A protein has these predicted regions:
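Accessory interaction regions appended to the cores of large information-processing enzymes
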Residues: 1-203
Length: 203
Protein backbone atom coordinates (compact mmCIF):
# COMPACT_ATOMS: atom_id res chain seq x y z
CA UNK A 1 0.00 0.00 0.00
CA UNK A 2 1.38 3.40 -1.00
CA UNK A 3 2.24 5.71 1.87
CA UNK A 4 -0.32 8.36 0.88
CA UNK A 5 -2.86 6.04 -0.69
CA UNK A 6 -5.83 4.14 0.68
CA UNK A 7 -8.01 1.19 -0.22
CA UNK A 8 -11.80 1.18 -0.58
CA UNK A 9 -14.20 -1.69 0.09
CA UNK A 10 -17.97 -2.12 -0.05
CA UNK A 11 -20.43 -4.92 0.65
CA UNK A 12 -24.17 -5.41 1.01
CA UNK A 13 -25.32 -8.48 2.95
CA UNK A 14 -28.61 -9.71 4.38
CA UNK A 15 -32.28 -8.82 4.23
CA UNK A 16 -34.29 -5.85 5.41
CA UNK A 17 -34.78 -4.48 7.94
CA UNK A 18 -31.49 -5.73 9.39
CA UNK A 19 -29.64 -5.55 6.06
CA UNK A 20 -26.00 -4.49 6.38
CA UNK A 21 -24.38 -2.06 3.96
CA UNK A 22 -20.71 -1.44 4.68
CA UNK A 23 -18.45 1.14 3.05
CA UNK A 24 -14.90 1.32 4.36
CA UNK A 25 -11.47 2.75 3.72
CA UNK A 26 -8.13 1.35 4.86
CA UNK A 27 -5.00 3.47 4.94
CA UNK A 28 -1.88 4.41 6.84
CA UNK A 29 -1.99 6.44 10.05
CA UNK A 30 0.24 9.13 8.57
CA UNK A 31 -1.89 9.46 5.42
CA UNK A 32 -5.32 10.98 4.67
CA UNK A 33 -7.18 8.08 6.28
CA UNK A 34 -5.26 8.58 9.51
CA UNK A 35 -6.15 12.28 9.45
CA UNK A 36 -9.82 11.50 8.79
CA UNK A 37 -9.73 8.93 11.62
CA UNK A 38 -8.41 11.50 14.10
CA UNK A 39 -10.86 14.18 12.94
CA UNK A 40 -13.88 11.87 13.20
CA UNK A 41 -12.93 10.70 16.67
CA UNK A 42 -12.11 14.15 18.03
CA UNK A 43 -15.02 16.03 16.43
CA UNK A 44 -18.19 14.01 17.08
CA UNK A 45 -21.33 14.89 15.13
CA UNK A 46 -24.79 14.69 16.66
CA UNK A 47 -26.44 11.42 15.65
CA UNK A 48 -23.31 10.19 13.87
CA UNK A 49 -20.82 9.82 16.69
CA UNK A 50 -17.84 7.71 15.63
CA UNK A 51 -16.84 4.89 17.98
CA UNK A 52 -13.91 2.51 18.15
CA UNK A 53 -14.58 -1.10 17.18
CA UNK A 54 -13.91 -3.30 20.19
CA UNK A 55 -13.66 -7.08 20.33
CA UNK A 56 -15.00 -6.81 23.88
CA UNK A 57 -15.15 -3.92 26.35
CA UNK A 58 -11.66 -2.45 26.90
CA UNK A 59 -10.16 -4.38 23.95
CA UNK A 60 -10.11 -2.34 20.70
CA UNK A 61 -9.33 -4.26 17.55
CA UNK A 62 -6.10 -3.88 15.55
CA UNK A 63 -5.70 -2.21 13.17
CA UNK A 64 -7.58 0.55 14.97
CA UNK A 65 -11.04 0.72 13.45
CA UNK A 66 -13.58 3.52 13.62
CA UNK A 67 -17.31 2.93 13.11
CA UNK A 68 -19.37 5.81 11.71
CA UNK A 69 -23.18 5.40 11.57
CA UNK A 70 -24.71 6.29 8.19
CA UNK A 71 -28.22 6.77 9.55
CA UNK A 72 -28.79 9.43 12.20
CA UNK A 73 -29.17 7.84 15.63
CA UNK A 74 -32.27 9.39 17.18
CA UNK A 75 -33.02 7.19 20.17
CA UNK A 76 -31.57 4.68 22.61
CA UNK A 77 -32.72 1.70 20.52
CA UNK A 78 -30.69 2.91 17.54
CA UNK A 79 -27.68 3.58 19.75
CA UNK A 80 -27.86 0.09 21.24
CA UNK A 81 -27.74 -1.50 17.78
CA UNK A 82 -24.56 0.42 16.93
CA UNK A 83 -22.88 0.12 20.33
CA UNK A 84 -23.86 -3.54 20.63
CA UNK A 85 -24.07 -6.02 17.76
CA UNK A 86 -22.72 -3.76 15.00
CA UNK A 87 -19.67 -2.65 17.00
CA UNK A 88 -18.83 -6.22 17.98
CA UNK A 89 -19.42 -7.58 14.48
CA UNK A 90 -17.15 -5.04 12.80
CA UNK A 91 -14.37 -5.64 15.34
CA UNK A 92 -14.61 -9.43 14.96
CA UNK A 93 -14.52 -9.16 11.16
CA UNK A 94 -11.39 -6.98 11.20
CA UNK A 95 -9.67 -9.26 13.73
CA UNK A 96 -10.51 -12.32 11.63
CA UNK A 97 -9.18 -10.57 8.52
CA UNK A 98 -5.83 -10.20 10.30
CA UNK A 99 -5.92 -13.76 11.63
CA UNK A 100 -6.60 -15.11 8.13
CA UNK A 101 -3.86 -13.01 6.52
CA UNK A 102 -6.15 -10.73 4.53
CA UNK A 103 -4.69 -7.76 6.43
CA UNK A 104 -0.96 -8.38 6.98
CA UNK A 105 -0.25 -8.82 10.68
CA UNK A 106 2.98 -6.85 10.33
CA UNK A 107 0.97 -3.77 9.26
CA UNK A 108 -1.66 -3.59 12.01
CA UNK A 109 0.12 -0.78 13.87
CA UNK A 110 0.59 1.22 10.67
CA UNK A 111 -2.99 1.08 9.38
CA UNK A 112 -6.37 2.44 10.41
CA UNK A 113 -9.81 1.48 9.13
CA UNK A 114 -12.90 3.68 8.89
CA UNK A 115 -16.14 1.74 8.51
CA UNK A 116 -19.41 3.43 7.56
CA UNK A 117 -22.22 1.26 8.93
CA UNK A 118 -25.86 1.27 7.81
CA UNK A 119 -28.38 0.26 10.46
CA UNK A 120 -32.01 0.38 9.31
CA UNK A 121 -34.20 2.35 11.76
CA UNK A 122 -36.65 -0.59 11.77
CA UNK A 123 -33.95 -3.16 12.54
CA UNK A 124 -34.71 -5.11 15.73
CA UNK A 125 -33.06 -8.53 15.56
CA UNK A 126 -29.65 -8.22 17.26
CA UNK A 127 -28.46 -11.59 15.97
CA UNK A 128 -29.19 -10.66 12.36
CA UNK A 129 -27.58 -7.25 12.78
CA UNK A 130 -24.46 -8.98 14.12
CA UNK A 131 -24.30 -11.70 11.46
CA UNK A 132 -24.99 -9.40 8.53
CA UNK A 133 -22.55 -6.70 9.64
CA UNK A 134 -19.85 -9.28 10.37
CA UNK A 135 -20.22 -10.81 6.92
CA UNK A 136 -20.43 -7.46 5.14
CA UNK A 137 -17.40 -6.02 6.94
CA UNK A 138 -15.29 -9.09 6.33
CA UNK A 139 -16.22 -9.10 2.64
CA UNK A 140 -15.60 -5.35 2.29
CA UNK A 141 -12.15 -5.68 3.90
CA UNK A 142 -11.26 -8.56 1.55
CA UNK A 143 -12.45 -6.60 -1.47
CA UNK A 144 -10.46 -3.53 -0.40
CA UNK A 145 -7.24 -5.48 0.12
CA UNK A 146 -7.68 -7.27 -3.22
CA UNK A 147 -8.62 -4.13 -5.16
CA UNK A 148 -12.03 -5.49 -6.09
CA UNK A 149 -13.64 -4.66 -8.40
CA UNK A 150 -11.20 -4.11 -11.22
CA UNK A 151 -12.27 -1.80 -14.02
CA UNK A 152 -12.85 -4.77 -16.36
CA UNK A 153 -15.47 -6.14 -13.96
CA UNK A 154 -17.15 -2.74 -13.65
CA UNK A 155 -17.40 -2.28 -17.41
CA UNK A 156 -18.66 -5.83 -17.93
CA UNK A 157 -21.32 -5.59 -15.24
CA UNK A 158 -22.62 -2.05 -15.82
CA UNK A 159 -25.23 -3.08 -18.44
CA UNK A 160 -26.68 -5.53 -15.89
CA UNK A 161 -27.00 -2.85 -13.20
CA UNK A 162 -29.47 -3.82 -10.48
CA UNK A 163 -29.79 -2.97 -6.80
CA UNK A 164 -32.15 -4.84 -4.50
CA UNK A 165 -32.91 -1.70 -2.48
CA UNK A 166 -34.06 0.26 -5.57
CA UNK A 167 -37.13 -1.90 -6.01
CA UNK A 168 -36.94 -2.13 -9.79
CA UNK A 169 -34.54 -3.29 -12.49
CA UNK A 170 -32.71 -0.58 -14.38
CA UNK A 171 -33.14 -0.74 -18.14
CA UNK A 172 -30.05 -1.00 -20.31
CA UNK A 173 -29.76 2.63 -21.35
CA UNK A 174 -27.35 1.71 -24.15
CA UNK A 175 -30.26 -0.05 -25.87
CA UNK A 176 -33.23 2.08 -24.74
CA UNK A 177 -36.69 0.61 -25.29
CA UNK A 178 -37.91 3.92 -26.67
CA UNK A 179 -39.63 4.77 -29.93
CA UNK A 180 -37.47 6.96 -32.14
CA UNK A 181 -39.47 9.38 -34.27
CA UNK A 182 -38.15 11.83 -36.84
CA UNK A 183 -40.49 14.69 -37.69
CA UNK A 184 -39.90 16.79 -40.81
CA UNK A 185 -42.44 19.62 -41.00
CA UNK A 186 -42.23 23.28 -41.87
CA UNK A 187 -45.14 24.09 -39.57
CA UNK A 188 -44.09 23.94 -35.90
CA UNK A 189 -47.75 23.83 -34.80
CA UNK A 190 -48.19 20.45 -36.48
CA UNK A 191 -45.08 19.14 -34.72
CA UNK A 192 -46.37 20.45 -31.40
CA UNK A 193 -49.74 18.78 -31.95
CA UNK A 194 -48.09 15.42 -32.63
CA UNK A 195 -45.87 15.72 -29.57
CA UNK A 196 -48.85 16.52 -27.35
CA UNK A 197 -50.59 13.36 -28.55
CA UNK A 198 -47.72 11.09 -27.50
CA UNK A 199 -48.13 9.21 -24.17
CA UNK A 200 -46.25 10.80 -21.28
CA UNK A 201 -45.05 7.51 -19.77
CA UNK A 202 -44.68 3.83 -20.53
CA UNK A 203 -47.54 1.39 -20.12
Amino acid sequence: MAKEGFLVGEALVGEEPEIAHIDLIIGRKEGPVGQAFANSLSQPRVGHTAILAVVRPNLPVKPATLIVPKVTIKDLEGAELIFGPAQSAVAKAVADAVDEGVIPRAMVEDLVVIVSVFIHPRGKDYQRVYRYNYAATKLAVKRAMEGFPGIDVVLEEKPKAAHEMIGFRINNLELPPYLGVELVFDDWRRVEGILRSLPRKDG
